[in-house]
Amino acid sequence: MLNKANKVFLMSCLAVLLLSDGSFAQKEEKQPNVTPVFEVQDLFESVRIPNIVVTTDGTVLAFAKSGRLLRRSEDGSKSWGPIQEVGSDSGGSAIVDDNNGDVMIVNSKGGYLWRSHDQGKTWKREEIVIKPNAVGHGTPDGIPVQTTCSESGVTLRYGKYKGRLLMPARIQPPKGNNDQEWWPYNHNTAIYSDDGGRTWQTSGPVQSGTGEGTLAELSNGNIYYNSRCHMAVDHRRRIAWSYDGGHMWTDWEVSEHLYEVGQPFYFKYGTKPSYGCNAGLVRLPLEATGGKDVLLFSTPDNPGSKRVRMTVWASFDGAKTWPVKRLVYEGLSAYSSLAAGQDGKVYLLFERGKKKLYESVAVARFNLEWLVKGQN
């Protein structure tokens, strides 16, 4: 809980973000975005694995069932079109190519993707090439790399690798085996493409025991990787950084501020670490923050215990600290995904339930003003 002085300081920071340059202030006079906004509605029933993105024209695409089901909103989540199927085998995570507006559901384990040229209205299946990393991880017919259950990917915007497509991914040897004895060998990685998604390179690893990752690029070109850990005795998230466009991951660390959550899992080895939970991560567009790096993170807020209390955290210093958080949903909640529009509106797609955990996938729409004013 922040004291009154710190709350005043954070509100001052928000004012700076909203009015830090003339062009943004002028834009806000025409289309105010300082009134707190918060709305929640259910989009899917009895399915799991949410993923959400905002396309280059502002269309919001909410995916469920690992990218197989889709609902579209062309008015900023106020209304939604009917459920449509991307493809019966379209399992994977989403990415928007900011270079040309294409949207893709990448199934790197299967060696293909589904692509849309029209903001998610229609889709076409394409074969892709997955190249392994230096130790041979990432081949569909060997030890595959998969994006399923990871956060959506990003188009890099800064520096030498501007325009590269980068997606969080994971390695599950052998051949995707999720048996308990193999968990120490599981680890997150990434895949990246410099040719619009036709060819993907598997990157180096992050910490062992990780899975279901999230990543975000800062305005200096550094890439922040935040991972679920299936063996977190300390109940904390795992962090890594890339300074070469996502090719290698260094500066591994344990988060001081973000806890791993999820019911303790019984291990035959005698320990009971948290089993962890998938999470969401997004960096707000610089156009909406006056050029400041503002990151948001989402996961249930119940360290080391059952999945409840879907919460969003905010960082204003490039993921060094996370001083603000706000509860979105009190009840049962689990996997989540975050996206943001150019106007600063944030979209949180998450699993929730009243009596059972996975009753629905809901979308919450809010802005930074709502998050900061009501921080808890």
Question: Could you tell me what each predicted segment is?
Answer:
Residues 10-20:
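Bacterial N-terminal signal peptides
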Residues 5, 18-19, 191:
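Disordered, low-complexity tails and leader-like regions
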Residues 1-10:
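Bacterial N-terminal signal peptides that target proteins for export
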Residues 22-24:
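Sec/Tat signal peptide C-region and signal peptidase I cleavage site
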Residues 26-376:
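Asp-box/BNR beta-propeller blade signature and adjacent active/binding-site loops
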